[in-house]
Amino acid sequence: MIKDRLLQLVHLLISLALIMGALGIGNTIQNLTGVSVPGSVIGMLVLFFSMTLGLVKVEWVKPGATLFIRYMILLFVPISVGLMQHFDMLLANALPIIASAVGGSLIVLISLAWFLDYLLKEKH
């Protein structure tokens, strides 16, 4: 029983180390290149491609990823508090925020419709 729990803990620590290692690599790449993409996004791409290439197995990352997903709601609490602290600024910029959200959604929807129309015409 204790041996199984200890083994689970080791797997979790390895998983978290892999995820944090990918994050560190992503942050390093972002700092060295100065690209405007966040280091966390680059890190997740590094992790994705290392899993795609078979360098990292899904089973190795799954315990840590499951833990993050299980407690994801707690990670949004600081963001929500920050929004409430700057609610007046959010209200002052409500129109541009809504316009960009609606406009961006329409652009994606129309682009997807054109692309699907093109693909369906190619098949027939």
Curated annotation (Swiss-Prot):
Keywords: Cell inner membrane, Cell membrane, Membrane, Transmembrane, Transmembrane helix. Belongs to the UPF0299 family. This is UPF0299 membrane protein VIBHAR_02118. The lineage of its organism: Bacteria, Pseudomonadati, Pseudomonadota, Gammaproteobacteria, Vibrionales. It comes from the Bacteria. Pfam families: LrgA (PF03788). It comes from Vibrio campbellii (strain ATCC BAA-1116). The chain crosses the membrane at residues 6-26, 35-55, 72-92, 95-115. It is a multi-pass membrane protein. Signal peptide: none annotated. InterPro entries: LrgA/CidA (IPR005538), Uncharacterised_UPF0299 (IPR022957). It is found in: Cell inner membrane. One of its GO terms (cellular component) is plasma membrane.
